[in-house]
C-alpha cells in the first residue's frame, strides 16, 4: 500500500499513471524522485492527505505497470524496452517536429519573441538528447549488459554518474520550455501549426520524464544491486 514513507519514484515505477498526479501537484518524480511522498508534499500544491488520497485511489483502480512492470525485467530486456519505447520514437519525432518549430518561430517570432527562445531551447534539447541516446546505444548500454552478465566493467559507476548529469541538464531544459509556454497553454491567436507544436512538445516532455525515470530509478538501480 502507498504510504507517506513510500518513495515517489517507486510509485511511478509501479503505477505509471501516478506521474500525472505528481506533475499536477508540481512534484518532480524524475530526477528528484528519490524522496518520500511526505517530503514531496512539502513542496507540493497539495496537502499530504490529498496527495495520498489520489495516489491510493489510483492504486486501487490500477494494475501495477499496466501489465508490464519494468522493474522485473532483466537489464538487457529493460534496455531493449527503453530503446523501443523511447529512443527510436524520439529520434523520429525530433526529425518530424523540427520543421514545424522552425516555421512557428520564423512566422510568429517577430511578434512573440519567446517563440524564438523556445526554438533555441528545443534545439538544445534535440542536440543533447540525440547525442545522449546515441552514446547510450553505442557505448553505455552494451557496457551495462556486459556488467549485468558478470563481466568486470571498471567504469560502470562513472557511466551512471555521467548519464545522470545528462538527465539533470535535459530536465532543466524541459522546465524552461514549460515555464516559457505557461505549461504549453495555447494562446488564442495561435495558428494550427503553433497548436501542433505545443501539443507535441508537451508529449515529448511527458515521454522524456518517463524515459529518464526508467533509467535513473529502475535500470541504474539494477546495476547497483
Swiss-Prot record:
GO molecular function: metal ion binding
Main location group: cytoplasm
Subcellular location: Cytoplasm
Disulfide bridge map: none
Database matches in HAMAP family: RIC_ScdA
Family per similarity comment: Belongs to the RIC family. ScdA subfamily.
Protein name: Iron-sulfur cluster repair protein ScdA
Organism whose genome encodes this protein: Staphylococcus lugdunensis (strain HKU09-01)
Lineage of origin: Bacteria, Bacillati, Bacillota, Bacilli, Bacillales
Amino acid at each position: 500500500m502507498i504510504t507517506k514513507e513510500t518513495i515517489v519514484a517507486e510509485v511511478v515505477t509501479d503505477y505509471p499513471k501516478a506521474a500525472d498526479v505528481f506533475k499536477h501537484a508540481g512534484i518532480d518524480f524524475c530526477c528528484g524522485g528519490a524522496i518520500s511522498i511526505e517530503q514531496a508534499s512539502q513542496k507540493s500544491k497539495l496537502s499530504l492527505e490529498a496527495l495520498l488520497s489520489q495516489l491510493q485511489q489510483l492504486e486501487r483502480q490500477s494494475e501495477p505497470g499496466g501489465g508490464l512492470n519494468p522493474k522485473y525485467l532483466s537489464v538487457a530486456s529493460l534496455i531493449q524496452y527503453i530503446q523501443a519505447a523511447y529512443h527510436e520514437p524520439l529520434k523520429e519525432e525530433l526529425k518530424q517536429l523540427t520543421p514545424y518549430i522552425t516555421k512557428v518561430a520564423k512566422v510568429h517570432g517577430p511578434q512573440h519573441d519567446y517563440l524564438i527562445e523556445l526554438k533555441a531551447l528545443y534545439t538544445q534539447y534535440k542536440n543533447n538528447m540525440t547525442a545522449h541516446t546515441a552514446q547510450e546505444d553505442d557505448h553505455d548500454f552494451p557496457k551495462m549488459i556486459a556488467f549485468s552478465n558478470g563481466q568486470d566493467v571498471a567504469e560502470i559507476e562513472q557511466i551512471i554518474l555521467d548519464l545522470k548529469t545528462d538527465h539533470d541538464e535535459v530536465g532543466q531544459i524541459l522546465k524552461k520550455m514549460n515555464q516559457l509556454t505557461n505549461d504549453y497553454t495555447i494562446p488564442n491567436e495561435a495558428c494550427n501549426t503553433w497548436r501542433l507544436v505545443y501539443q507535441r512538445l508537451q508529449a515529448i516532455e511527458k515521454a522524456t520524464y518517463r524515459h529518464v525515470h526508467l533509467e535513473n530509478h529502475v535500470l541504474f538501480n539494477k546495476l547497483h544491486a
